[in-house]
Amino acid sequence: DQFALPNDFVLLVPGGAIHRPKKRWSTEKYSELARQFFVEGLVPILLGGISEAEILEEISINCPQAINLCGQTSLLQIATLARQARLSVGNDTGPMHLIAAVGRRTVVLYGNSSDPALCGQRGPHVTYLRKPNIKDITVESVKAVSIA
């Protein structure tokens, strides 16, 4: 394995289109989620492109145990990581479509800026969490569907 990752990890995909900030859950909440997963024995792996470096770095600072793979993964590597992960959590963004298709547990966060019925990720183990304002989705609600 190129990244030498631990056996038990969760993928976090906190980015999204720069021109659509309403599709992004807050870095503070991703940081808290990452810390909680780590306490439970799941190492958070952060995925995103170079344009999301600042977001991933902030989460890394707030959860130093997270492994930041910003800009280091190809689509094939993302699919491979998703297959190995216990769970993936992310915003409505391109990589989450690929991750969902792999077939592992996937939680995708939505506000009202897009509709999962029309453009949602598809796969056998996909859960959508949606609030009119994505910022109103709580860490607790993400955790609840993550362990269901």
Predicted regions and their residues:
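Short glycine-rich anion-binding loops that position phosphate/pyrophosphate groups of nucleotides
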Residues: 15-18, 94-95
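CheY-like receiver
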Residues: 2-3, 33, 81, 145
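Nucleotide-sugar donor-binding patch of glycosyltransferase catalytic domains
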Residues: 61, 68-69, 97-148
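Charged active-site motifs of nucleotide-sugar-dependent glycosyltransferases
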Residues: 3-13, 42-45
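Donor-binding and catalytic core of enzymes assembling or modifying cell-surface/extracellular glycoconjugates
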Residues: 27-107, 111-114
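Residue-level signal for inorganic ion chemistry
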Residues: 12, 30, 142
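A nucleotide-sugar donor-handling region in carbohydrate enzymes
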Residues: 1-9, 20, 137
